[in-house]
Amino acid sequence: MKKILFFALALVASVLAFTSCEKNEPELKGTVYHYRGISWADFEYEHDVYIALEDNHKMTMKWVGVKTSEDAEPVNLYLYDGIWEGNATEGYHIHCDALPQLPDGKPFDKWESFDIDGWCDATSCSFDYHINGSTMGIFDGEIVND
């Protein structure tokens, strides 16, 4: 009986140890956009707002502001005629000088957008973007604070 009890306790301890070693990565939600071979995404992570910009298969992520209201709509920042626009005017404080410049200096005037799901830790993020349940691609990169 003692052997069975010892075995059961060892099994429970090993299961608990295994589950406690799993990476605890907060999920994030946002939107990814595509235009002329350049992709970018906006997302929130622990009340901070980031933009991830991908050009030529290289990605940088940059902090651009903070969420100031729990009732705010999900962040949505996009470029139109070279100007950042979106619904992040209420419930967010976006630092305009922190918004990235376009790699080629051309304005985005048309885009495709997809919802994203993923995770972040203190230095990097990884998320996939999808439409109608089909994964369209993956962003994965370091957070760069300029």
Label the predicted regions:
Residues 91-117:
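An anionic, turn-rich surface loop/hairpin at beta-sheet edges
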Residues 44-85:
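N-terminal glycine/threonine-rich, aromatic-flanked beta-hairpin/loop signature
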Residues 3-5, 10, 14-37, 133-146:
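Bacterial Sec-dependent N-terminal signal peptides
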Residues 74-93, 122-146:
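Edge beta-strand at a domain terminus
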Residues 40-43, 66-76, 101-108, 134:
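Short, cysteine-centered beta-strand-loop-beta hairpins and adjacent loop/turn segments enriched
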Residues 25-36, 56-61, 89-97, 123-126:
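Short, hydrophobic/aromatic-rich segments at coil-to-beta transitions
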